[in-house]
Amino acid sequence: MSGDAFNMSVAYQPSGMAVPEWLNKGDNAWQMISATLVGMQSVPGLVILYGSIVKKKWAVNSAFMALYAFAAVWLCWVTWGYNMSFGHKLLPFWGKARPALGQSFLLAQAVLPQTTQFYKGGGGADAVVETPWVNPLYPMATMVYFQCVFAAITLILLAGSLLGRMNIKAWMLFVPLWLTFSYTVGAFSLWGGGFLFHWGVMDYSGGYVIHLSSGVAGFTAAYWVGPRSTKDRERFPPNNVLLMLTGAGILWMGWAGFNGGDPYSANIDSSLAVLNTNICAATSLLVWTCLDVIFFKKPSVIGAVQGMITGLVCITPGAGLVQGWAAIVMGILSGSIPWFTMMVVHKRSRLLQQVDDTLGVFHTHAVAGFLGGATTGLFAEPVLCSLFLPVTNSRGAFYPGRGGGLQFVRQVAGALFIICWNVVVTSLVCLAVRAVVPLRMPEEELAIGDDAVHGEEAYALWGDGEKYDSTKHGWYSDNNDTHHNNNKAAPSGVTQNV
């Protein structure tokens, strides 16, 4: 056998053009895997979840809204969005728009140029560096990919508030506008080296940038778009609960990349973040389910999914910053407080009743995201903070030492900025889109659904996803196919057909 057969591929040699000295193959591989996991949360995860959790006549439209947003964000991101979020500073809350497409840019070592932290708050000659800029050991192409899927899922989560009535043409315009004028501001301010980043506001993986933003913006957009049809608001059953669980499962497992990739390295903090994520999600799901059983006498599968999501959202701002016991506490809170706002406060609030938030994104993402940010300000452990944050000696208020109480104030102030910005900008975007096309579908399309909007239907089945109505069709027995047209209680052995 020739000795050449044993030659190592250039990709695995210690040096060479494809493997520069600064490249860490483990970090690069983990970052691309994390990005792909987050991408799979959207496609197919949320595509499946949205397509199955809605009424049958809206399955195609709901899934397509997610698919379109994922594709549209990609093009906007590499054309101008990435550098507005992670490039050089234009304003304290915004980066300069420029493409992220050139070979020299994408193959260079990744760096977030505005993330250098100075003790005296500036970059002058007398300034002393507190923490150097973020400079991961992989190419910029990996960073652009990783951050893009986060931007995409934010728009898709926002869409959950608008399912079942938003004009698809209006959605096509809304996505690039909202990405440009809202998402990039939150991302730069908190992650890219903006004023909240340097002030020390903690958002480990997007509790504010993604979840609080999408929840508030979704609720605001739902106000401007208007409600679903009266019939749909009264009855909106999921068309396939098992597919809904499939999408939810992809979402849960994909969160390993969502939170595990944010240290920008395959390090010990990444491992802790993944573990805490699962602890909090499991705790929240169980608490939500227990509350359903206590107050409604039955465990709701949809409720379990909502509890899972609120747990995942709540841990996101502090996934790698809190200890395991704190993740359990956050899970208890995220399984109970959003449950209370959705099941109790929502029914008593005129504003919440007026705004038709289809999937309750305000509760599952805005409330849970704010809760996660606030509790991170309480439970962030000092040693863990030193592994990730630019401001040294950061800590939550629960831990003694200088700055703990101030950290909680920072967290609340950061949340208020994100809330106010999204209310104002989302309203302006909706008004701008409304000047071009109607935000809401016409009543004729609302009555028909997918076939009117897309000329396609998800299932060639009878009915609209609702259960068999015994008051109209009588009882059907497994032992007797005779239908009894009466309103008496179902006898033993009787089932309600779907």
From Swiss-Prot:
Organism of derivation: Oryza sativa subsp. japonica (Rice)
Keywords: Ammonia transport, Membrane, Transmembrane, Transmembrane helix, Transport
Tissue-level expression: Expressed in root.
Function summary: Involved in ammonium transport.
Membrane-crossing residue ranges in chain numbering: 33-53, 58-78, 143-163, 171-191, 206-226, 241-261, 276-296, 301-321, 325-345, 369-389, 412-432
Stated family: Belongs to the ammonia transporter channel (TC 1.A.11.2) family.
GO CC terms, sorted: plasma membrane
Comp. bias (Polar residues): 487-498
Biological processes per GO annotation: ammonium transmembrane transport
Membrane topology per record: Multi-pass membrane protein
Name assigned to this protein: Ammonium transporter 3 member 1
InterPro entries documented for this protein: Ammonium/urea_transptr (IPR029020), Ammonium_transpt (IPR001905), Ammonium_transpt_CS (IPR018047), NH4_transpt_AmtB-like_dom (IPR024041)
Sequence segments annotated as region (Disordered): 478-498
GO MF, any single term: ammonium channel activity
Subcellular location: Membrane
